[in-house]
Amino acid sequence: MTKRSKVFVPAVVTVATVGVAAGAAYVARYRKDDVKELFVAQALERPAARQSYTELAQGLERAGIALFQRAGRADDTQANRAVLTHIIGLERWGQERLRVALGEREFVRDEHHPYKPGAGVSLRELQDLLSQTRARTVDLARRLNASPPAEGTTVEHNGLGPLTPKGWLRYLTQHADLESRKLRGAKEAKALGE
């Protein structure tokens, strides 16, 4: 390889990398709705549509086991309490959206913040609330199975747009799973230098 080609290859790689990054930035800025729709379709709606409400309820239960284990190992820190508070609040908010799909309430465009447990709730209380909240979500999935909404029913998600009830169940499962990975035990926090 000549000296010229040794310089040329990294330059081409750098230009290509910058081009990909610029393209990603363009898509993120100007095509974010397209990206969001693709995410909703590929990560939420398509996998959820292949499952029955019974299977989604079972998935919520299975994911709940891992969720409760992570919460059980969590050290009593403000950061961990904040994560659990967020998970509980968002799941309760999602439950209200599922009740809209069941015809039990009218749609209200609100945020998840009012559904969060109040300040000063202990870690142990949050762990119990998490278990109760997930049990209610599983119950809603079973009720959806017993009385499925009409085909094509959607309920608005403030950030993701309209979701089917099955999409909502998958979203709640995935959200809690991803957020709970932020929980840290005492040993993990020390290893990470916190």
Where in this protein do the model-derived segments appear?
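Acidic/histidine-rich alpha-helical segments that form the ligand environment
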Residues: 53-70, 114-155, 170-172
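Hydrophobic alpha-helical topogenic segments used for membrane insertion/localization
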Residues: 4-28
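Short, flexible active-site recognition loops that position polar ligands and cofactors
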Residues: 162-173
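Short, helix-capping/interhelical loops that line the mouth of catalytic, cofactor-
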Residues: 23-54, 93-134, 150-151, 191-194
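A hydrophobic membrane-anchoring alpha-helix module
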Residues: 172-190
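Helix-loop segments that flank and shape redox-cofactor active sites
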Residues: 61-82, 103-110, 145-164, 192
